[in-house]
UniProtKB/Swiss-Prot annotation:
Induction cue: Activated by activin, basic fibroblast growth factor (BFGF) and fork head.
Binding-site list for Ca(2+) 1: 92-93, 98, 128-129
Protein residues bound to Ca(2+) 2: 93, 129, 132, 134
Protein name, as recorded: Sonic hedgehog protein
Residues with lipidation of kind N-palmitoyl cysteine: 27
Lipidation (Cholesterol glycine ester): 200
Annotated site location: Cleavage: 200-201
Catalytic activity: glycyl-L-cysteinyl-[protein] + cholesterol + H(+) = [protein]-C-terminal glycyl cholesterol ester + N-terminal L-cysteinyl-[protein]
Species whose genome carries this gene: Cynops pyrrhogaster
Annotated site location: Essential for auto-cleavage: 271
Top-level taxon of the source organism: Eukaryota
Similarity field: Belongs to the hedgehog family.
Protein keywords: Autocatalytic cleavage, Calcium, Cell membrane, Developmental protein, Endoplasmic reticulum, Golgi apparatus, Hydrolase, Lipoprotein, Membrane, Metal-binding, Palmitate, Protease, Signal, Transferase, Zinc
Signal peptide segment: 1-26
Length: 432
């Protein structure tokens, strides 16, 4: 008990110090990682284009239809009215139905309203259709669940609708469709969806390489294990496994599968992977540092990775990293969710280099934020070396769920960081 009190005091002091460190400093692997991301130029959606490029009611988008909600149904309490003064609701039925929606839909719509006013001063977001209680849409429409809205701009300038669709996607809607020249259709996942909040994890069956030369499932890691990772210069090293920032043994989650010609890695939408832009014809090895310096690898959410991007994999000899082109990205359900943290902040998982961090797209920021935890665990190991040098089962503090330190960082991050730096599927819902 005394040791845990000491650890928490050290972490608190260290965290305050970490807040004073300039966030722009880079400590990611290689020169290209950890640099501040340039402003992203937004491209309007074309007419009839939808994003992501999968059907609306699939896991990769808004998910399956769960049944119509009526005013008399038990699920009616899932809907909440939206009285945002920056949004115009057409409400042609004069019932207020268009204002009713799920909380997730409301959050994304409110975020979009801000983006619209920033993009076009004097223009507001306009909702033409929200929750439908009258049966005006096709069968199994997500409008019947309050999970979909049809939108325009208040000036009804159709030349803006392509950019409006892009802004909706950036605001976090799970599926956006330039459905009609008269409106944009947007929808979200169900509140209880397995993919609604994914956190940042790997499945329990994902493997890591230990210093002893064996590979084990990530779920079997113990404090004291040294796992294959990469240091700040891009060299492969064996790094101390510290703990799991999230650990759920039986939960089923949706994972993005990033597949190259030889390797495949599974990770949740909000987890960070080191990615380079498409570079045709270069799927060979080479010096890791020169790769970063010339090709611009950076941390990226798994949900943003596309075919043609490049990732870093362990070469055949197991001595270094090579770049490999992503051939396919798809979704897969798997059991277990584990977020291991190493001393270096990186981990080679299924022979692909990944960050240990998630939710915030800047690896270097996350690594600095976790510095107090690394220092605190180091001090604790000095007083109790047996806790961190044996292969005994994890201590009671390593129970299931999200680690308290990670929860604190997430809450602080939502207060001090801009919304577009935090993944909309960031913190996993707590296990029940």
């Amino acid at each position: 008990m005394d040791e845990m009190i000491l650890l928490r005091r050290v972490l608190l002091a260290g965290f305050i110090c970490a807040l004073l460190v300039p966030s722009g400093l880079s400590c990611g692997p290689g020169r290209g990682i950890g640099t501040r991301k340039r402003f992203k130029k937004l491209t309007p959606l074309a007419y009839k284009q939808f994003t992501p490029n999968v059907p609306e009611k699939t896991l990769g988008a808004s998910g399956r239809y769960e049944g119509k909600i009526t005013r008399n149904s038990e699920r009616f309490k899932e809907l909440t009215p939206n009285y945002n003064p920056d949004i115009i609701f057409k409400d042609e039925e004069n019932t207020g139905a268009d204002r009713l929606m799920t909380q997730r839909c409301k959050d994304k719509l409110n975020a979009l309203a801000i983006s619209v006013m920033n993009q076009w001063p004097g223009v507001k977001l306009r909702v033409t259709e929200g929750w439908d209680e009258d049966g005006h849409h096709f069968e199994e429409s997500l409008h019947y669940e309050g999970r979909a809205v049809d939108i325009t701009t208040s000036d009804r300038d159709r030349s803006k609708y392509g950019m409006l669709a892009r802004l909706a996607a950036e605001a976090g809607f799970d599926w956006v469709y330039f459905e009609s020249k008269a409106h944009i259709h947007c929808s979200v996942k169900a509140e209880n969806s397995v993919a609604a909040k994914s956190g940042g994890c790997f499945p329990g069956s994902a493997t890591v390489a230990l210093e002893q030369g064996v590979r084990i499932p990530v779920k079997d890691l113990r404090p004291g294990d040294r796992v294959l990772a990469a240091d700040g210069l891009g060299k492969l090293v064996y790094s101390d496994f510290l703990l799991f920032m999230d650990k759920e043994e039986t939960v089923r989650k949706v994972f993005y599968v990033i597949e190259t010609s030889r390797e495949r890695v599974r990770l949740t939408a909000a987890h960070l992977l080191f990615v380079g832009q498409a570079h045709p014809g270069n799927d060979s090895g080479g010096d890791f540092r020169s790769v970063f310096g010339s090709a611009g690898f950076r941390s990226m959410f798994a949900s943003s990775v596309r075919a043609g991007h490049r990732v870093l994999t362990v070469d055949r000899e197991g001595r270094g990293l090579r770049e490999a082109t992503v051939e396919r990205v798809y979704l897969e359900e798997a059991t277990g969710a584990y977020a291991p943290v190493t001393a270096h902040g990186t981990v080679v998982i299924d022979r692909v280099l990944a960050s240990c961090y998630a939710v915030i797209e800047e690896h270097s920021w996350a690594h600095w934020a976790f510095a107090p935890l690394r220092v605190g665990l180091g001090i604790l190991s000095f007083f109790s070396p047996q806790d961190y040098s044996s292969h005994s089962p994890p201590a009671p503090s390593q129970s299931e769920g999200v680690h308290w330190y990670s929860e604190i960082l997430y809450r602080i991050g939502t207060w001090v960081l801009q919304e577009d730096t935090i993944h909309p599927l960031g913190m996993a819902a707590k296990s029940s």
